[in-house]
Design a protein with these regions (language model features):
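Binuclear metal-dependent phosphoesterase catalytic core
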Residues: 112-124, 129, 222-287
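Hydrophobic or amphipathic alpha-helical targeting/insertion segments
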Residues: 75-80, 102-103
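His/Asp/Glu-rich metal-coordinating catalytic cores
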Residues: 55, 84-218
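Accessory, non-catalytic peripheral segments of nucleic-acid enzymes
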Residues: 37, 42, 247-379
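Glycine-rich phosphate-binding loop signature in dinucleotide/nucleotide-binding domains
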Residues: 35-39, 119-121, 162-165, 284-286
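N-terminal active-site segment of His-dependent metallophosphoesterases
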Residues: 1-68, 72, 361-372, 376
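A short helix->loop->beta-strand "cap" motif at the edges of active sites that frequently abuts
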Residues: 72-77, 166
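Divalent metal-coordination and catalytic microenvironments
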Residues: 8, 28, 43, 48, ...
Length: 379
């Protein structure tokens, strides 16, 4: 049985205020063409279908179009919500969609139930596990000792018992310890949301989403497929692809990657203003790519961004790297941290973990706690 493993579409994404919707449709059309030339039995979508919990209408229409195209090809789709998605919104209409063999993970309420497909080698059981936080799992099992993401996932999978005689596939969206991340993903502070790769050992293939770089974690069959597009300049050197997975008889798994070619690459350029505006250096190059340009001139160039965009219309970011900026970076880094109050440090941490700022009431409560702690220490 052959699968296409996709994740992290991040439909509706904006990079440096540039909308990615046209590029996303372009790459989805390319994926559909690959499916036409590389037939599969089902498509796995491992979370972060959208970039935000409340996606723009254009992003919703784009996903609707893509799922409809997959349905026209009579392909079952197995999709889960990721940390960027609203699980409730993604699950809307899931019972109706299932009648068209588009299976969407419900809002988490307990261990996933298998959905079974069959081929010449027998049954394949697919389990859909949306992005989990410890609080979600504690709500289902209030007496379980759940203090971490690892505890939460372990509890859920302890209640999930794949038939050892069947081939089993899990679609999930978590940080797995040992995987490499990049800056375009939601930051992890102190690794508190990582989970142990050994928790997935009972599954023949684990289709992971969350990390943007295609990679295996430990074994070949525990795998992130990565994003179909580059979403930050930390990904500039990556080669994006889609992952094809073939399950033979029990224990036999073959994995292959097919490269994707974007409408606009996302690249970094470096040099002096004179070098980058010299026609001999840019003629014949992809000047309409999404670019981060670093100028090495010692003096700022007046209206450099506007002038460079005459040649490079999709210039997203402009920086300088010279003696002045290097000195400023050395001086600013410790000063910025020292200037922040304890509440500001906690607010930064909270936003990183929850993708939303503290409310006024929460900030007041936290400040009261901080003051109480300081009073106790002074006493």
């Amino acid at each position: 049985m052959r699968f296409l493993h996709l994740s992290d579409l991040h439909l509706g994404k904006r990079v440096c205020e540039f909308s990615m919707l046209d590029d996303q449709r372009y790459i989805l059309e390319q994926i559909l063409s690959l499916l036409d030339s590389h037939p599969v039995d089902a498509v796995l979508l491992a979370g972060d279908l959208y970039d935000k919990p409340v996606p723009p209408a254009e992003a919703v229409r784009l996903l609707d179009w893509f799922l409809t195209e997959l349905s026209h090809r009579e392909l079952p789709v197995f999709a889960i919500s990721g940390n960027h998605d609203s699980a409730d919104r993604v699950a809307f209409g899931s019972a109706l969609l299932a009648e068209s063999r588009v299976y969407v993970s419900p809002v988490f309420s307990g261990p996933p139930e298998p959905i079974t497909l069959t081929d010449a080698h027998g049954p394949v059981d697919l389990y859909l596990l949306p992005f989990l936080k410890p609080a979600m799992v504690r709500h289902v099992w209030p007496d379980a000792p759940i203090e971490s993401y690892n505890d939460a996932l372990a509890c859920v999978l302890d209640h999930c018992s794949p038939d050892p005689a069947h081939r089993s596939v899990l679609v999930a969206h978590q940080f797995v310890a040992g995987a490499a991340s990049c800056e375009s993903e939601e930051p992890s502070v102190g690794g508190i949301d990582w989970v142990d790769a050994a928790l997935f050992d009972k599954f023949d293939y684990v289709a992971l989403g969350h990390l943007h770089s295609p990679q295996k974690v430990g074994r070949d069959t525990l795998r992130y497929c990565g994003t179909p597009l580059k979403y930050s300049f930390s990904e500039a050197s990556q080669h994006k692809s889609v992952t094809f997975v073939e399950l033979g008889e029990k224990g036999s798994v073959t994995i292959a990657a097919e490269p994707l070619v974007p409408q606009h690459d996302l690249r970094e350029l470096r040099g002096s203003y004179m070098e980058l505006t010299d026609r001999r250096n840019y003629e014949g190059t992809a000047v309409d790519d999404y670019l981060h340009i670093t100028l090495t001139d010692e003096q700022d160039i007046p209206e450099a961004l506007a002038r460079l965009r005459v040649i490079y219309p999709n210039l997203m970011r402009l920086d300088y790297d010279n003696r002045r900026t290097q000195t400023r970076q050395e001086l600013d880094a410790p000063a910025k941290a020292e200037q922040k109050t304890p509440l500001e440090h906690f607010a930064d941490f909270y936003q990183l973990q929850n993708n939303q700022p503290l409310t006024h009431e929460q900030a007041v409560f936290c400040q009261q706690l901080i003051e109480t702690i300081w009073k106790e220490e002074d006493a």
